[in-house]
Structure formats: structure tokens, C-alpha cells
Swiss-Prot record:
One Pfam family it belongs to: SurE
Required cofactor(s): a divalent metal cation
Name of the featured protein: 5'-nucleotidase SurE
UniProt xrefs under InterPro entries: SurE, SurE-like_Pase/nucleotidase, SurE-like_sf
Recorded family membership: Belongs to the SurE nucleotidase family.
Amino acid sequence: MRILISNDDGVNAPGLVALHAALADYAECVVIAPDQDKSGASSSLTLDRPLHPHTLANGFISLNGTPTDCVHLGIHGLLENQPDMVVSGINLGANLGDDVLYSGTVAAALEGRFLQRPSFAFSFLSRQPDNLATAAHYARLLVEAHEQLDLPPRTVLNVNIPNLPLEHIRGIQLTRLGHRARAAAPVKVVDPRGRAGYWIAAAGDVEDGGAGTDFHAVIQGYVSITPLQLDRTYQDGFSSLNTWLEGLR
């Protein structure tokens, strides 16, 4: 078993190191990760310049690209031995609800599944690594257990782990994505030369976080697992859209 590990926090992130340590005695693990923080990169590929891999002293491969670049290059030629699966994380910070649209952590897993590898994305509900061992424990547990799972085609598992000691985790729940309210407006700043710039503001508050959602599960102390599909076609909308199109003919 060979596992390609990536993330969006960067090649030196503590979550990446913890994930590698958790899986290293289970499988042959290769790390290819961005050379800097690429949070919010989503599924972007770098098309305007060449990518340059660099092997670090610890054996991790640093790449001047996005998380999706890392997985794409890892499966398409950089590695002599092809990986059997892709594991992304452990992200320091949640990827819940609408976060998955922007997350580089989730995007790395989606790219792995697009390239026909079973894939997981792991995120931890804290920017601090205090209880990171809890997330590493569940990453190992679920990756090992995937051998008993017939993962549906074009589906990845998005996993969020509460910031709690292991003994305080209440279990694992299968969840749907919740929803956030609209994010705050960008924050305008002016540099010393009088030039205006903007910071993207924080994500919106939880708007749909009821029972059954990923938000609800982690707040209640459960690990949340949400199956995500590559196919974003809205099949249920075909009937009304066909009626609309008929009126245009």
C-alpha cells in the first residue's frame, strides 16, 4: 500500500507531520505538499509557470504549487511508484459546510478521486495543535478501515475532528454539509503609499447547522464524515429546467 499525502497548510505544517507519523507504519507514505500556505486554493491548477519539486531533509517533497498540483503531479509522473490512495490534511481549521468549495485540503482529495484513487480529507477544528493527536488517531483508524469499504465511484470522504482529547470524543457520525451565512464584506486597507487594498473577510456564521449536519456533529463532540461527490449535476432540477427551456423554443 502506497499513500500520497498532501495538504493546503504547507509542507512544514504540524498537521501534515502528524498525519505522516500516524500512517507511516501502516503504509509506504510519500508527502508532496505546497511550499507555502495555500489555504483557500480550491481545485486550482498552476498553468502559468513550471512546477519545481524539491526534496527536503525529512524526505517530504515541497512543490511551488497548489494542493491539486501536488496530487496531480504525484500521480502523473513525479513518483516512480504510483500511490494507491490519497490522504489530505490534517488541516488546522475546520472544513465544514460551504467551506468545501474553497478548501485546498478537500480539493487535494477530490483530485485524487478524480484520478481514480480512494481519497480522504481530514480537518481539525482548531488553528492550534493542542489536541492534534486526536485527529491523527482518527485519520489512522479511518484510513485502515477503508479496506473494508467499497467507496462509491467519484466520492471522497470529508472528515472533521473536534478539538477535544481523545477520551472526550463521543463517536463518529455520517453527516450532510451544513450551510454558512454570507461572509462579511472584504476589509479595505490603505498602505503607507496611499494605495487601497482588500483583505478577504472571515467565513460567515453557521446558518444551517441542525441535526444531521457536519456542524452539529462536531459541536456535539462527534467526528463528522461527509461523503462528497465529484459530480455536481443537480438532477432534481431537470424537470423545472426542462419546462423553462420548452418555453424558450
